[in-house]
């Protein structure tokens, strides 16, 4: 994958527009989870160190296009950036006709989704973005799967279009995990439905040695293998699909599970062998025997890709399976990559972030890359690099 990289460019005195993913949760006008902002800081700092006049843009939420809405304003993000960078980061609302930014200064543009034509990737808007800068830097992996004005269109028209350090690191880590993975490779794919992760399961079944499934997905595979799953969430119409995937790759199934009579934080948890699951049981986690077996598989892997917790870890009594696997991934010598919102929450809960080789910031983009789909914002950077 050949793209121009911001790190290789001379930015002294250049106007640089950086597209970051600053779509963070805001509560009462204050940023409530700052992971994405923290991830963007090294790129912004590097551009400033290189002597650029820096303009940062992002979307936040899903406002009605073309209309300002206070709840989707990036003002809280501008306030956060000012503190984090130790300098004033003004929020600029009217920027499409040009902005006065001096070398060594940084401004944040108001939500790009307030601009008509952003979602539709309108050429006219993209050309306005491009006219603002000498160099466009795409650094938002989390929105790279969307062809929008500020992620794709601007890269077509900017004088120079490059990948930022965060985007470049994501592509390198995913390329390493999927392109030429160290063997053996184990993937964990968990979630409520096979149908939503079908392309991921199919794609990984072609490159993995072991495909560990969890959550409702595991229940569908268990039912497909003839096991009773009680009143657990599963997809009866996808049993043949599960069997077809299991015929292509080793899918180790749970031998014991943690069940409850109801889905609730107060529900009593009972460990049962899979053969003993009753008609009124709900499977909400893998059992200790299964967790220990899966942990051994992970510890002997060369590459691990983790997408999704294997149980309802939000409730502690159904979190031991995910905790055991998280600790095993942390202790493994494998190159490990993790992605997806629930996965990141589990990593935080069990304190293993430092021991995972790479944590992807992109949810949908992460999955689409794993599925083997082309990410439009990356494709346009490749095309520009060839030209």
From Swiss-Prot:
Gene3D superfamilies reported for this sequence: Phosphoglycerate kinase, N-terminal domain
Name of the featured protein: Phosphoglycerate kinase
Residues where ATP binds: 197, 314, 340-343
Catalysed reactions listed for this entry: (2R)-3-phosphoglycerate + ATP = (2R)-3-phospho-glyceroyl phosphate + ADP
Entry binding sites for substrate: 21-23, 36, 59-62, 113, 146
Enzyme class: transferase
Pathway linked to the protein: Carbohydrate degradation; glycolysis; pyruvate from D-glyceraldehyde 3-phosphate: step 2/5
UniProt xrefs under InterPro entries: Phosphoglycerate_kinase, Phosphoglycerate_kinase_CS, Phosphoglycerate_kinase_N, Phosphoglycerate_kinase_sf
Chief site of localization: cytoplasm
This protein's GO CC annotations: cytosol
GO molecular-function terms, A-Z: ADP binding; ATP binding; phosphoglycerate kinase activity
Gene: pgk
Subunit structure: Monomer.
Biological-process GO terms, alphabetical: gluconeogenesis; glycolytic process
UniProt keyword terms in alphabetical order: ATP-binding, Cytoplasm, Glycolysis, Kinase, Nucleotide-binding, Transferase
Keyword check for Cytoplasm: yes
EC numbers on record: 2.7.2.3
Entry's localization field: Cytoplasm
Family classification: Belongs to the phosphoglycerate kinase family.
Organism domain of life: Bacteria
């Amino acid at each position: 994958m050949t793209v121009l990289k911001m790190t290789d460019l001379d930015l002294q005195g250049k106007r640089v527009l950086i597209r970051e993913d600053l779509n963070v949760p805001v509560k009462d006008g204050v940023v409530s989870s700052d992971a994405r902002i923290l991830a963007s800081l090294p790129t912004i700092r590097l551009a400033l160190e290189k002597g650029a006049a820096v303009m940062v843009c992002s979307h936040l939420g899903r406002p009605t296009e073309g209309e300002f809405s206070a709840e989707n304003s990036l003002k809280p993000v501008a306030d956060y950036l000012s503190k984090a960078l130790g300098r004033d980061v003004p929020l600029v609302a009217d920027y499409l006709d040009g902005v006065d930014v001096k070398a060594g200064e940084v401004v944040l543009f108001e939500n790009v989704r307030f601009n008509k034509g952003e979602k539709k990737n309108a050429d006219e808007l993209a050309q306005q973005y491009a006219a603002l800068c000498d160099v466009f830097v795409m650094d938002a992996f989390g929105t790279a799967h969307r062809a929008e004005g500020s992620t794709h269109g601007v890269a077509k028209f900017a004088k120079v279009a490059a990948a930022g350090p965060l985007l470049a690191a994501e592509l390198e880590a995913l390329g390493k995990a999927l392109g030429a993975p160290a063997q053996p490779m184990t993937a964990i794919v968990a979630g409520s439905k096979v149908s939503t992760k079908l392309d991921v399961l199919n794609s990984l079944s072609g490159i993995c040695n072991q495909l560990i499934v969890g959550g409702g997905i595991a229940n569908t595979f268990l039912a497909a293998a003839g096991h009773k799953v009680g009143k657990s969430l599963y997809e009866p119409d996808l049993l043949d699909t599960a069997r077809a995937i299991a015929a292509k790759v080793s899918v180790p199934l749970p031998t014991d599970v943690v069940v409850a009579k109801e889905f609730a934080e107060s529900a009593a948890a009972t460990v049962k062998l899979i053969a003993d699951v009753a008609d009124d049981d709900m499977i909400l986690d893998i059992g200790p025997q299964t967790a220990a077996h899966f942990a051994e598989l992970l510890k002997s892997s060369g590459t691990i890709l983790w997408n999704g917790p294997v149980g309802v870890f939000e409730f502690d009594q159904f979190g031991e399976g995910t905790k055991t696997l998280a600790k095993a991934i942390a202790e493994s010598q494998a190159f490990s990559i993790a992605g997806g919102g629930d996965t990141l929450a589990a990593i935080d809960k069990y304190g293993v972030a430092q021991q995972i080789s790479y944590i992807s910031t992109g949810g949908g983009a992460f999955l689409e890359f794993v599925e083997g789909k082309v990410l439009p914002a990356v494709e346009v950077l490749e095309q520009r690099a060839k030209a």
